[in-house]
């Protein structure tokens, strides 16, 4: 699997799907390209300001002041436990992907968010063995090596172990559950 490299955006525990993509933006239609991009524009806009972009807080994920901006500068979200809790909302991992996020690294996930991420092929949900929110700062350059189960903070040169993706790795590499089924001639 390819490595993911880019800037990290750090959040705390219990980031729910309403914070990832607030309900007022669910009226956009993801099958219309111009509306699909708006999911990226409003990704993580529901996170309270003091919890956005840790450790300092107050760092917006997407600069909403720029009306033409639909993506973020961050390729990796680093979070604490229970990431993606709340309602079952397939739009949550879609919004992160549309914002340019390629992977989320969290201590644990709400299972429905994890499955929506894998099944839709939106973002790679990696699990850290230790809580990285106190080790990585928003803006740090990180590299995730899925084959060797490591996250390297390129800013500090520290490395951290990740749990293996296991059976879902093949689904992720295929681009989601439907693509995986087609490649296996299941569907």
Kindly give the residue locations of the regions a language model identified:
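Catalytic or ion-coupling anion/metal-binding cores of large enzyme and transporter domains
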Residues: 1-41, 154-160, 164-166, 179
